[in-house]
Design a protein with these regions (language model features):
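Short amphipathic alpha-helix that is part of the acyltransferase structural core
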Residues: 1-27, 37
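Extended interaction regions within the primary functional domain
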Residues: 9-12, 35, 57, 66
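Conserved beta-strand in the GNAT
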Residues: 37, 43-52, 56-64
Length: 72
């Protein structure tokens, strides 16, 4: 199940750090971006943060998947 996360996004920091190793960089886009988390059996397996850059342009800032679920 994919869930749109609108608050307390930082609780997924460990997952986001898999794709962006600097917490300071994550802090720059996390709150202004739209966040989606993929759950399986109530466990977050993947996360994606997308920002609106204006002029009908969106950018994927972070897309992270737990290592054991990558390449599937």
């Amino acid at each position: 199940m994919v869930v749109h996360i609108t608050e307390n996004k930082k609780r997924f920091l460990n997952l986001l750090l898999l794709a962006d190793e600097q917490e300071s960089m994550i802090d720059r886009y996390l709150e202004r971006g739209e966040m989606f988390v993929l759950y399986k059996n109530e466990i977050p397996l993947a996360a994606c943060v997308i920002t609106d850059e204006g002029d009908n342009v969106c950018e994927i800032k972070n897309i992270a998947v737990l290592p054991q679920y990558q390449r599937q």
